[in-house]
């Protein structure tokens, strides 16, 4: 049995699955979960992962601390008694804003459609709760209606996902980074609970207008509802505690398998903060990363380059009032805690939502420069049909959704198992339905094996397999797409220069491949 087969035989996806479930233990909200930036729950989970890395046999295990803004979301419970005397209790999700009551406090609640400026015309919302329906995927982010409500004097905004996210069930809540100030509070309410409130508003208006309104009409458009239901309000009670903590600390947990030949590093990363239970996002990813580390140690692998395993804090959010408030832990790790990683880390393999098939075809998304090498690697794989019937492909460039972007802008070639284009995002992502029920063992097993093999493939290289001609071709394509933005002489000069650079980059990549092939051959001779 060769070393690759030996390590693969040590993969235990049940061990990884159980670790992912154990990560759910610590939570800021005892009902909904949440393991948020700088919170006690995140810190305790980091401590557990620190101990786990040591138990696996990783060396130089550290907690790399950094400054950020934290968030503790303990509860947001809305109570309402309808005209029949039935009391309803709604669990609401939270956003990274400040709002704290002294037990249940009474408020007026109004419904204002999409929460646009036009929806507020003629309505006094000062001190009230404003309920709106938004679609963050196709229209606008939560930050816009929240700030609109704040400017109008509302006590808080309650956002209902009309579509875009949380589509799996009408009871789904949603959470996202607020991308705004902490003093404009917001909460998340499910469509099912919002429907109860809207029905009561409709009944109240119907009674006041001598039954001229059809109280049973639930087929109105959002605009029709906004025009009708804004005429009245409801009495509700809210018990909430959401606290933003400026300038606190968090820690990225790192461990190593020391390299034997170079001071270069191969980085594996995944984040351990979460919304709700966060089983796929990103418990399963952290657990897979450590499951791979465990297999390499148990299998006796001695890497040429040092393997670094990093559980990142604060990926979901970590900065007050910023458009760039996510991937805080990764950004701090590579720019402030370990700027020395720039130039030493030859690849970052980042993991997100890896125990679920997001499409019939799997994909590794990577920076332009690594696309050729990754494609050559995927061509060598046998993909199990029960995991991905249509095999695997390679996509580039990377996107801004995940921590590999922070690594890439620091100059580290990065990859991630592609997750952003599938239906999981519209249905389960950042909702309480991201739990163990969406676990797919065949996918998880394949990803353990695939990325263990990719680590070894990269580790066998003496030079990073970077083909800059892909980058130059992408630049040229963007020029053609935006041709009218350039004067013709400037465009032609730029394109000619790009052709020259592209040819040079292809020659350099050919030489890199030649040297890597000769090095791989020498390793075979040594082993013999």
What do these predicted ranges mean?
Residues 10-14, 18-21, 25-126:
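Noncatalytic luminal/extracellular "stalk/propeptide" segments of secretory-pathway proteins
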Residues 37, 90-188, 390-393:
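Extracellular/luminal Protease-associated
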Residues 248, 353-478:
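Active-site-adjacent substrate-binding region
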Residues 137-148, 249-252, 274-369:
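Acidic/histidine-rich catalytic neighborhood of metal-dependent amide-processing enzymes
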